[in-house]
Amino acid sequence: MRQIIIAGNWKMNTTLSEACTLVQSMKCELERIEGIEKIICPPFISLYPIKTILENSSIKLGAQNLFYQEKGAYTGEISPLMLKELCQYVIIGHSERRAYFGETGQVVNQKIKAALQAGLLPIVCVGEKPEENENGQTRQVLETQLKEALDGLNLSCIIIAYEPIWAIGTGKAATASEANSAIGYIRRVLGDTLGNAAAQTSPILYGGSVNEKNITEILSQTNIDGALVGGASLKAESFVSICRQAAVIQNKH
């Protein structure tokens, strides 16, 4: 069985002091949870202080974005080399980046290559819009996004997060069977794109209104290897509960 990954995406939430308080409030409980990969993705400004708090911890850090150049006249951007000193993971291609900042499949591809070059592990997000879901275009959209994102890459493993846009922040998660079906298809596309071995080793996460009440059902599905958690990751009790339930499932196998 692939190792379960639980990643908390804080998005544009928490001040510096709030971020440090939140991490300190759940650090001890999270460190007691074994067998899964636990990742926190705070805003950029909180990465360094949280890194200090989590020194020698089993809890990993991730960024929410990066730019694809190492340095230069790119005002307001963060480079892979800067992040490499602070964290292990980086979220790339989140639907909010695509919607609000116009990120294309080509840009996502450049960012993945830049992250890998710097030794960062990308968490690549894909997912369909509400109207695409209603029109039966989910598979077509996922295939296009994946092929654009992975163009020119020869990888033995990549982390993918399936986040149907209609489920993000709405409180309306995809049903476990819907998520399982879509993620099964993503694995097929990975097989076609990167080869069967990569498809079998690559963790595929579900994201979209994940909480402590639905995580066990989600992770009990055969194709789902973890979760990218939004709002629930901003509540210490909820995030710890999600990680604890994930570890129970992991340790059964």
From Swiss-Prot:
Superkingdom classification of source: Bacteria
Functional pathway: Carbohydrate biosynthesis; gluconeogenesis; Carbohydrate degradation; glycolysis; D-glyceraldehyde 3-phosphate from glycerone phosphate: step 1/1
Catalytic activities: D-glyceraldehyde 3-phosphate = dihydroxyacetone phosphate
Gene Ontology MF terms in the entry: triose-phosphate isomerase activity
Localization per record: Cytoplasm
Principal location class: cytoplasm
Known EC number: 5.3.1.1
SUPFAM superfamilies noted in UniProt: Triosephosphate isomerase (TIM)
Subunit and interaction comment: Homodimer.
Family named by the database record: Belongs to the triosephosphate isomerase family.
The protein, known as: Triosephosphate isomerase
Gene that this sequence comes from: tpiA
